[in-house]
Swiss-Prot record:
Keyword 4Fe-4S: no
Organism the protein comes from: Salinispora tropica (strain ATCC BAA-916 / DSM 44818 / JCM 13857 / NBRC 105044 / CNB-440)
Name under which the protein is recorded: Na(+)/H(+) antiporter NhaA 2
Chain segments annotated as coiled-coil in the UniProt record: none
Region feature (Disordered): 409-453
GO molecular function, one term: sodium:proton antiporter activity
Lineage: Bacteria, Bacillati, Actinomycetota, Actinomycetes, Micromonosporales
Keyword Cell membrane carried by entry: yes
Membrane topology annotation: Multi-pass membrane protein
Origin: domain of life: Bacteria
Subcellular location as annotated: Cell membrane
Gene Ontology CC terms: plasma membrane
GO biological process: regulation of pH
């Protein structure tokens, strides 16, 4: 997939600069900053004297009409660029299931269950709040159920540099599974008119794509047309086109071609993820935020009107209350009712902070919001304001909570390390330990000894 880059001499200035830029874009803080910048620019532009230019840009139509792909730029961002984002998310998901933490169900049980709780609880909170509103308000039940991987990991990268590595693994597993559920929700509940013929025809380019990869054919001139054809057929079927990104990702081999290959040799999946992640973080997600986050607030009165809409209240409550409630409650139940491993340097303070990070919906929530309510309507604008507000509140609360173990850890008197049997919870990893484990943590991970005979 990086054939053009391989054509450059290894020591060339262009290649060095390209590699440097790509490395910067792979950093989680960079992706989150670009995402936030796109959203801020959209909000400022939509509320400036040049707001008409923003609307004109979003509605500008481009694409081949004979393929029914004459779409607005906003639609291209939603259906096209987000497919790249979901392709990367699908690669991460498959990597975790095949070679990562999810390959062992016992280790993955807690974050997977937490993800399910983090979908059900905010949806339930939203439904409870909007049940008395108009009937169409319930169409947005899935908006607060999503987690923005890029934004959440970026916030964690900034505030959690002194946290155990297991914290990031737990969040990544939770967010990836959360996005998988969101993709299934989009495919099942937000497909209005299903065309069976193009949907069945999707199998042809998808299978060809998979066969080429199995044979280690990585020519961009062969793979890209097949990927674009798969995307176009999914789009024509009525299923949201982002699903194509996940389908393509799931057929990418996650293991080295031969068992005799050196264990350090990257798989095709790792190579694809390495090559395409900068495109997702540096282009796809920020441009989608630019195209989708802009909403005319209308001053203080407009803001009050938006935030008093039952739908907006339901979205904010779902993200800020429902998400943490679902994640924490299900995590507690699973760790108490099953024999999941304890220890791994995670405390309930960590879980509480991570549950707030999961409340950063943003990208996927904006997508579901556009699928739930017609663009340009007052309710759709209220949903946008609610998503931005709820995500920011969740991010701030997460930052405050996750700074607590940092301060406590620096003093060496974090109460959660004193009684590991009561405060530690299972996570998706058993591989990471703190650089300087406390005696309590060390004892908690030692097998029980039988009395000497």
């Amino acid at each position: 997939m990086d054939a053009t880059r391989r054509d450059l001499p290894p020591g060339s200035v262009v290649r060095r600069r390209t590699d440097r830029i790509a490395d910067v874009l792979r950093a989680e803080t960079t992706g989150g900053a670009l995402l936030l910048a796109g959203a801020v620019i959209a909000l400022i532009w939509a509320n400036s004297p040049g707001a008409a230019g923003y609307d004109a840009m979003r509605s500008f139509t481009v694409g081949p009409a004979w393929l029914h792909l004459d779409l607005s730029l906003a639609a291209w961002a939603k259906d096209g660029l987000l497919a790249v984002f979901f392709f990367v998310a699908g690669l991460e998901l498959k990597r975790e299931f095949v070679t990562g933490e999810l390959r062992q169900p016992r280790r993955a049980a807690v974050p997977i269950a937490a993800a399910v709780g983090g979908v059900l609880a905010p949806a339930a909170v939203y439904v409870l709040i909007t049940a008395a509103a108009e009937a169409d308000a319930l169409r947005g039940w899935a908006i607060p159920a999503a987690t923005d991987i890029a934004f959440a990991l970026a916030v964690l990268a900034v505030i959690g540099r002194h946290l155990p590595p297991a914290v990031r693994v737990f969040l990544l597993t939770l967010a990836v599974v959360d996005d998988l559920i969101a993709i299934m929700i989009i495919a099942v509940f937000y497909t209005a008119n299903l065309s069976v013929t193009p949907l069945l025809a999707t199998a042809l380019p998808l299978v060809a794509f998979a066969i080429l990869l199995r044979r280690r054919v990585t020519s961009v001139w062969l793979l890209l047309p097949l990927a674009l054809t798969t995307w176009a057929l999914v789009h024509a079927s009525g299923v949201h086109a982002t699903v194509a990104g996940v389908l393509l990702a799931l057929v990418v081999p996650a293991r080295p071609h031969s068992q005799h290959e050196h264990t350090a040799a990257p798989s095709l999946l790792e190579r694809f993820e390495h090559a395409i992640k900068p495109v997702s973080a540096g282009l796809a997600v920020p441009v989608f935020a630019l195209m989708s986050a802009g909403v005319a607030i209308g001053g203080l009165g407009g803001l009050v009107s938006a935030l008093t809409d039952p739908v907006a209240i339901g979205v904010i409550a779902g993200l800020v209350i429902g998400k943490p409630l679902g994640v924490i409650a299900v995590t507690w139940l699973v760790t108490r009712l099953t024999r999941t491993g304890l220890g791994n340097n995670l405390t309930w303070t960590h879980i509480t902070g991570l549950s707030m990070l999961a409340g950063i919906g943003f990208t996927v929530s904006l997508l579901i919001g556009e699928l739930s309510f017609a663009a340009g309507t007052e309710r759709h604008d209220h949903v946008k304001i609610a998503i931005v507000t709820g995500s920011l509140i969740a991010a701030v609360l997460a930052a405050v909570i996750l700074r607590l173990p940092n301060r406590a850890g620096s003093r060496g008197n974090d109460a959660t390390t004193r009684d590991p049997d009561q405060t530690r919870v299972g996570t998706a990893t058993q591989r990471t330990t703190p650089d300087h484990p406390t005696p309590a943590a060390t004892d908690a991970n030692q097998p029980a000894r039988s009395p000497a005979p």
